[in-house]
Design a protein with these regions (language model features):
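Eukaryotic scaffold repeat domains enriched in small/polar residues
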Residues: 1-354
Length: 354
């Protein structure tokens, strides 16, 4: 539904932004989101690989960082710029996975394949990069999610070594926690990560089908969600966000034909509130431009019985909360768009029956 009120909270679908594009105005498998102080959104495009039948011509398509303004309603979105591209040279990306922006506007991007963090300024100029590998690592760690706290400490999840590592912004490792397992505090392929206003760290524990909450030093605090088939369950959570009220938003993959992913919402105590499955009933402005430029495409769209299947999420991978505008941003990965929900306060439910 477009508007849902639960436990004093109202989530109201706003609009969506995006279309499939390997460059420029659009996205290519967006997998991470971050906002800067000016309200611009940095989108990590995982892209794809174009692999010919010869080993020396293996190239990637679409891997980059897009910078966009989402606007307050449909039609106000604006493509601002993009930077980086596929490759292993300094400033380039192969498997970009996470992004965060610090108070100075510096953009930090993790790369699972290269096991490093690349740093850019807000204009996209490359500044530096540093490895997430540490002495004693026996294999690549798969740097995935990244978050930053109020003290400028970076937290990076290692999907292959099942850890969370702490770094300074120049790459000095401050410590780590976690090991492979399913017990309290243990991890199995951690992915998305965030830090709340009180400094607690939340980790999307992908293969354990839960989110875990820690202190900034890695002490286990609580588990949010659990695996299963019930409405409140989690299935392969990929990312997590927390709003100023303490409500927790968990991005999940559900691998079945009728439910290809959703956002599960919990209150600060970990009680399930509701789930969002996507409501993009209208094409984005950019997608409308694509349709308008291709009359055959428009004809075929008018021939389908219903476009309802494309309204919902398809393997959403990232979620972020825009505090300044009190709204939730969801990277609808396989549909190459961002769906946006406003969190409303003092919403008055109409007193009528329809």
């Amino acid at each position: 539904m477009l508007t849902e009120t639960v436990a004093g909270r109202t989530y109201d679908y706003s609009h969506n932004v995006g279309r499939g594009s390997a460059t420029g105005m659009g996205f290519a498998n967006p997998v991470a989101l971050a906002l800067d102080a000016d309200g611009a959104v940095y989108v990590v495009n995982r892209g794809g690989e174009s692999i010919s039948n010869v080993p020396w011509d293996r190239t990637g398509v679409g891997a980059r960082i897009s910078k966009v303004s989402l606007g307050s309603q449909a039609g106000e979105e604006e493509y601002l710029s993009e930077f980086s591209r596929y490759g292993s040279a300094p400033g380039q990306l192969i498997w970009p996975a996470g992004v965060v922006v610090d108070a100075q506007g510096h953009v930090y991007v993790t790369d699972e394949w290269l096991n490093r963090v690349s740093v850019f300024d807000k204009e996209g100029n490359f500044l530096s990069c540093w490895s997430t590998l540490q002495s004693g690592d026996s294999e690549p760690n798969g740097a995935a999610g990244i978050a930053i706290d109020a003290h400028n400490t970076l937290y990076v999840t290692d999907g292959r070594s099942h850890k969370v590592r702490k770094f300074t912004t120049d790459g000095t490792c401050l410590g780590s926690w976690g090991r492979l397992g399913s017990g309290p505090g243990e991890l199995d392929s951690p992915w998305g990560i965030t830090v709340d206003d009180e400094g607690y760290v939340y980790v999307a524990d992908f293969k354990n089908h839960r989110v875990q909450k820690y202190t900034s030093n890695g002490e286990f605090v609580a588990q949010i969600g659990s695996p299963g088939t019930k409405r409140a369950s989690l299935s392969n959570p990929t990312d997590v966000a927390v709003d100023p009220d303490g409500d927790v938003y968990i991005c999940t993959w559900n691998k079945n034909a009728w439910d290809r992913g959703r956002i599960q919402i919990f209150d600060p105590e970990g009680h399930f509130l509701t789930g969002l499955m996507g409501d993009a009933q209208q094409l984005s402005m950019w997608a409308e431009m694509t349709v308008a430029a291709n009359t055959d495409y428009l004809k075929r769209r008018r021939e389908v019985r219903s476009t309802e299947p494309e309204w919902t999420f398809a393997q959403p991978t990232a979620v972020a909360f825009d505090v300044a505008n009190s709204r939730l941003l969801v990277a609808d990965t396989q549909r190459s768009r961002i769906q946006i929900y406003n969190k409303l306060s003092n919403y008055l439910v109409p007193q009528m029956n329809l």
